[in-house]
């Protein structure tokens, strides 16, 4: 099973509706580090995911995984800002985010040592793939739709490809147990619409 197939299986059999989803993976961080970067009050009691539509807030579930932290939210509109990625990767850490939403905008972003390495709001349709790090390019190419190729097809699951790239960046391989544990951990409110794709 390839890395992408591993994540396709996790998504297909896991506890989440993947139509709208943000997955944040941080190596070397604590839950408090992640909560602070996302604007979450970790002292608040966890609850079920809020059902009401709220443009200002979503909610994250956070859990420890071997070597770091996994955080998940279900709106696809509360993915972390670039500043949050920088903060989470400071001090030798690494972080990656994969986001899909009802607009079918699939984001992949990553940072190391306090610097954003790559980020794109719709990475499948990137006009110029040259900014993609060489270590990610073989996986990226599985999902990328080349605008110059009239016969291009996006058969690969872009979220699964994103998670495979997140593993390359962070060194953390997510498991079915990780996904179930984060789903069972409960949710805490987090602000929405904090990501600005073109922010420096």
Predicted features and spans:
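Long, compositionally biased intrinsically disordered terminal regions
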Residues: 4, 10, 112-200
């Amino acid at each position: 099973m390839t890395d992408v197939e591993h994540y396709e299986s996790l998504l297909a059999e896991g506890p989440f509706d993947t139509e709208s989803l943000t997955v944040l993976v941080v190596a070397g961080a604590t839950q408090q580090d992640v909560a602070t970067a996302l604007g979450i009050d970790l002292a608040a009691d966890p609850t079920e995911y809020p059902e009401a539509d709220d443009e200002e807030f979503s909610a994250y579930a956070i859990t420890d995984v071997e070597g770091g932290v996994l955080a998940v939210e279900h709106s696809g509109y509360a993915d972390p800002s670039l500043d949050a990625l920088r903060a989470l990767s400071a001090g030798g850490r690494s972080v990656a985010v994969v986001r899909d939403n009802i607009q079918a905008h699939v984001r992949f972003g990553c940072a190391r040592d306090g610097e954003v390495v790559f980020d794109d709001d719709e990475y499948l349709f990137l006009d110029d793939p040259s900014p993609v790090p060489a270590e990610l390019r073989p996986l990226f190419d599985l999902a990328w739709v080349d605008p110059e190729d009239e016969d291009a097809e996006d058969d690969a699951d872009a979220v699964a490809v994103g998670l495979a790239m997140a593993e390359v960046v962070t060194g953390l391989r997510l498991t079915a147990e990780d996904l179930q544990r984060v789903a069972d951990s409960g949710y805490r409110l987090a602000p929405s619409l904090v990501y600005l794709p073109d922010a420096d």
